[in-house]
């Protein structure tokens, strides 16, 4: 995502298209409607100075960044056809947290890529533990026909891949629950995504700026009226797992 525009011709005024410029243009469009811009699937090498400053300085762009690293070990990344290392990734995330205070970070880790040793698996585990990402998706490597990885002879045994995956899942669940709980006590806008009916009554389901729809949990509101698409102001009063409990703020509060 971050390198969007690099394969496009310059504009009429001689500017090279970039994701940052596109985000600035979209921000102008959504500004009158108080819209949010959330950018997902940014690659580490695409995090340019221009992009970081645009995320920091454009109010419509949420301070939420999804950078799926897959791994942090340099050798494994090279085998994946990716660049980077633990130290380079550490420096990137340190910079992001410094330049965009309060930001939320999402990433992805892959377990059991061909040739991954116990030590390299531990390196990924330790890095994710160190970084305390707000959200981390974890996947088990699965060979796909025709890919470079599928042709590698040093496939990791399934039972080892499953063990490494479960170990990392246990970690990111703990980190995620703690990160979600940090938002208890905040007052923020919630976009209503749906309305659920049950024997216990009606519940509004929505998401906040720090929750990407359909992957980062939701806000559950037991009392109040709103339609899908409405934006309501809520107090976040409790959390469970990745979910939040919200109470709609009265207009007079």
Enumerate the predicted regions with their spans.
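Terminal RNA-binding accessory module
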Residues: 151-253
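Short, cationic motifs built from Arg/Lys/His that form the positively charged side of catalytic pockets
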Residues: 82, 97, 144, 161-164, ...
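Short beta-alpha junctions and helix-cap segments that line functional grooves
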Residues: 51-52, 124, 220-222
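Short, small-residue-rich loop/turn micro-motifs
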Residues: 2, 68-73, 140-145, 208-210
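C-terminal, non-catalytic macromolecule-binding modules
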Residues: 119, 123-162, 168
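Conserved SAM/AdoMet-binding glycine-rich loop
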Residues: 1-121, 129-130
């Amino acid at each position: 995502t971050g390198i969007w525009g690099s394969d496009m011709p310059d504009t009429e005024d001689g500017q090279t298209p970039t994701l940052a410029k596109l985000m600035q243009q979209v921000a102008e469009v959504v500004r009158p409607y108080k819209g949010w811009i959330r950018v997902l699937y940014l690659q580490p090498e695409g995090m340019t100075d221009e992009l970081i400053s645009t995320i920091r300085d454009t109010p419509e762009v949420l301070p939420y960044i999804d950078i799926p690293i897959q791994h942090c070990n340099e050798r494994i990344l090279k085998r994946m056809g990716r660049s980077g290392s633990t130290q380079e990734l550490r420096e990137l995330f340190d910079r992001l947290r410094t330049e965009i205070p309060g930001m939320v970070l999402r990433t992805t880790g892959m377990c059991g890529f061909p040739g991954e040793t116990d030590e390299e698996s531990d390196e990924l585990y330790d890095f994710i533990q160190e970084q305390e990402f707000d959200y981390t998706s974890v996947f088990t490597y699965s060979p796909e026909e025709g890919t470079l990885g599928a042709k590698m002879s040093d496939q990791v045994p399934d039972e080892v891949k499953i063990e490494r995956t479960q170990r990392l899942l246990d970690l990111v669940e703990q980190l995620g629950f703690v990160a979600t709980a940090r938002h208890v006590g905040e007052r923020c806008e919630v976009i209503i995504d749906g309305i659920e009916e049950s024997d216990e009554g009606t519940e509004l389901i929505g998401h906040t700026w720090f929750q990407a729809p359909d992957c980062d949990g939701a806000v559950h509101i037991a009392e109040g009226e709103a339609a899908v698409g409405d934006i309501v102001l809520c107090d976040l009063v409790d959390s469970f797992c990745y979910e939040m409990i919200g109470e709609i703020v009265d207009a007079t509060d």
